[in-house]
Amino acid sequence: MGTHALILAGGGLAGIAWETGILQGIADEAPATARALLDSDILVGTSAGSAVAAQISGSVPLRLLYERQVAEDSHELDPGVDIEALGRLFLDAVSQPDATARQKLQRIGVIAASSPTVSEPVRRQVIERRLPSHDWPD
């Protein structure tokens, strides 16, 4: 028999929740299909998909991973972003009629580079809480 792979895409926190929910939905409706997906020989993920791949390859059951996604309490950080203000900020950055595309992108880069971020240890702790194991496999 050939090698089977499960490929998971990115999508940030929404991607993690969506992919976990889809897998749980498949498990609820088509258990044999879910087993085939979860027992893939290779798990590949980009960004959010890599987090889901790491989670489903561990010892934590899919149902518990799903329940963590829908729980009221979360270890995720609240970005504290006003989405409308962010939209206006980017719209202002790109709607300068005399600016070149490069200048518009540079303006967005300046905004991004000057935005406050969490410290590396805080971010690392959030990611560690998502993972079922902190040991690297052989």
Residue ranges and their predicted role:
Residues 1-46, 54-138:
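Patatin-like phospholipase
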Residues 49:
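Short, conserved catalytic/metal-binding motifs centered on acidic residues
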